Amino acid sequence: MRSSLLATAMLICLASTAHGQKAQPKTERRNVAVEVFQVLGLPVNVHEAVLLPKDGGYLLRCRMSNESSSEISGLRYVLTSIDVVGGTQLIANRTEGFGLPGYGTKSLTFVTPIKFNPKEGNRFVLMVEQVLSAEAIWEVIKAKDTLEAYVKGDYSIQPNVMRVTNLVDAPTQIRVIY
């Protein structure tokens, strides 16, 4: 009697466990961690980058800090996938606009979805290529070559940054006529 009661209890436990496993969705999308390749010459540092699932794509969320006195109005970034086998694939190359005050920090979620299917075991690397402010533009020289070297494990190549005056978005100078 006791052994049949124990067998019945175990059968019920196994059946409920099997039923619970079938109820879970098979294609559950999760947040994807992103490694950030920091470029030291840029006035923006990116931290805590993650891809959030949303409507068939992913949104990039990150925390940014501004190391300059001028307000940052946008940036251009590259998101690359590193396959387990060693191949790389460009996922996104985007320009995003936002407002980040001088010496400020902000958490941002870029609302333009990135459409791709992440594979299990892939690494994702984010690199900022260009930073825009009203006074200046910071551009990484040979950003593609630097990112390719970083992805292959060659950390000896450091990116060079060129800073130029922003003549398009620069505020107009006040002229005093005597």
Residue ranges and their predicted role:
Residues 4-14:
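Sec-dependent N-terminal signal peptides
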Residues 17-20:
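Sec/Tat signal peptide C-region and signal peptidase I cleavage site
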Residues 23-61, 146-177:
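Low-complexity, acidic Ser/Thr/Pro/Gly-rich terminal tails and inter-domain linkers that flank the onset
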Residues 66-71, 85, 168:
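Short, acidic/polar linear motifs in exposed loop/turn regions
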Residues 70-74, 89, 172-174:
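Short acidic/proline- and small/hydrophobic-mixed sequence motifs that coincide with surface turns
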Residues 81-91:
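Short aromatic-acidic-glycine turn motif
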Residues 89-118:
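Intrinsically disordered, low-complexity Pro/Gly/Ser/Thr-rich segments with frequent PxxP/GP/PP motifs
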Residues 113-173:
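Terminal connector regions
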